Amino acid sequence: MATRRRTAIAEALTRLLPRVPYLDAEAIRAAAGARHMRDLSTGAAVWLAALAHIRHAHTDYDELRDEGYERDEARYFVLDDTNRTLERWGSVRRLQSVEDDDPAEADRIDP
């Protein structure tokens, strides 16, 4: 990953989630810098990476999927937990619905 993009990701993460724990920040930075995120703005890549990390590491999302829930159903059930984590980490943004983390809408998410 180019140094300029890496720096921009770190800055966007600090703006979006000022109180994110270090290990979580490392995972989010790595995901935001992944090849499939390159076409997104830096802010959108960080936002989507943060949502995915929170969903998989800090909610029951994976367990719900293992129990047979569809993706959007599982996302709906972990929406409140996701928002609580965003609040704890200092984000002023919240998810209103499961569509708020749709990659098709990501470029309008810049912090």
Which residue ranges define each predicted feature?
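Structure-specific DNA junction-binding interface
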Residues: 1-111
